[in-house]
Design a protein with these regions (language model features):
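Recognition helix of helix-turn-helix/homeodomain-like DNA-binding domains
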Residues: 30-45
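Short basic helix-loop element that most often maps to the first helix and adjoining turn
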Residues: 9-28
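Short, basic-rich loop-to-helix N-cap that marks the start of a DNA-contacting helix
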Residues: 43-53, 72
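Conserved hydrophobic/aromatic packing and binding residues within compact polymer-binding modules
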Residues: 11, 25-26, 36-39, 65
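Helix-turn-helix DNA-binding elements, focusing on the entry/boundary residues of the two helices
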Residues: 11, 22, 33, 48-51
Length: 73
């Protein structure tokens, strides 16, 4: 699995665990809804700045979004 796919899957898992919609996460992170969807599908490669904004919106450590498991610690 590519790193972009791992990151996207972890973002989706944490977002759903937090009860957030894709739209609310995109808004909170200051990103376009379509771009956020592309990230979750592993089709977009976000910059480190964007990854940090997503992690902040999800209230999680950005490093954990890159791991194969335990993304929501």
């Amino acid at each position: 699995m590519r790193l972009a796919e791992i990151f996207g899957a972890n973002v989706r898992r944490v977002r759903l665990k937090r009860g957030m919609t894709l739209e609310s996460l995109a808004t909170e992170a200051g990103l376009a809804y379509s771009y956020m969807g592309g990230i979750e599908r592993g089709q977009k490669n976000p910059s480190l700045d964007v990854a940090e904004r997503i992690a902040k919106a999800l209230e999680c450590d950005p490093v954990n979004l890159l791991r194969m498991t335990s993304a929501d610690k």
